[in-house]
Amino acid sequence: SGEWELGVHIADVANFVETGSEIDLEAERRGNSAYLPRLVLPMIPETLSNGVCSLQEGVPRFTKSAFINLDKRGRVMSTRLARTLIHSRKRLTYLEAQALIEGDQKLARQHTRAEPAYEDELLDALRRADKLARIIRARRLRDGMLVLGLPEFELVFDEDGRVIDAQPEDDAFTHTIIEMFMVEANEAVARTFSDLSLPLLRRVHPEPTFHDIEELREHARVVGFNLPEEPNRTDIKSLLDATRSSPASRAIHFAVLRTLTKATYSPAIIGHFALAGDHYAHFTSPIRRYPDLMVHRAIDAFLDHTENGRKVPGGKGRARLRSTLGGDSRIADEGRLLEIGRHCSDTEVAAEGAERDLRSFLVIQFLAEKHLGDELPGVVTHIRPNGGLFVSLDRYLVDGMASL
């Protein structure tokens, strides 16, 4: 029939972290895990995140699942949430999975971290996942999803923790497979609560303001692209697509990134501009994001009153369900959601800033020791009206101002 069923299974952290417990209070305070170069500051103890909350190969694990039915063009027809118990058949790295999709088992074995045994059922599942992700991505691009073509590099360290080089991160499509499936699950959860008119901590991304757009319009004019005074998402997507393969790609895509507002956490239903979605929440990383853990608790309330998601009533029954869930403490009220949303938005900014600053420090330390006085290739990403150029180095992705 060409129809698909996608199942996305996420570790049931809420099953092990009780509301109001010491672990929960500390997780709330931290807001999220912080990923610094060579150091992770976890939101919850590693005995949980690397133990019973880790979906390990060959081990049964409690999960929450989103089941999404899609038509042959990737349009969502129905969704269902449930508590589940899964038994992971195989752990794969991204490059290993990509090689298997491409039919190269020899290359796959070079990237494995587990026993390199690949059953036909696994290979077929990978190929189907690849096909479905491409269908979903094509649908999202038609809907206006923005895709920034910005390079990413990972630092290479010696045994003493000092940077000795940088190398491009792999661009395997398997990263996109996971991304597309996670986005579908996040939307399915957000839609479920929107359909019931229930409050939820959402991930929101407002439209950029037109004041911020003016600088982007100037960048676009330099490369011969005329953005209207009040561009919409389609206009910005056209600019990104038109410059994706040009020498100006990085500068333009950086300019778009600077123009876009920062996504935050809020109970407001204002959608996600970059994803071209009306309803979005974070559900897929409760190990490392407190908003996801709050969403999981809200899902627990929903599942308790719908026979594990199997019986979601309509009509008057839906109104009764809404009233019942509205009195369940696991579904926080808007005041509490606003408070947590602001806090977790702030902790996210702090964690990202710490990662960025430490990375820049380590790279600059390396450049000062090994490349002082050398000429290095870079891209001009911004010109100050009163003089000076901002340059981003190609290989190390650090920015600096060159005075004129």
Task: Please place each PLM-identified region on the residue numbering.
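Electropositive polyanion-binding surfaces
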Residues: S1-L404
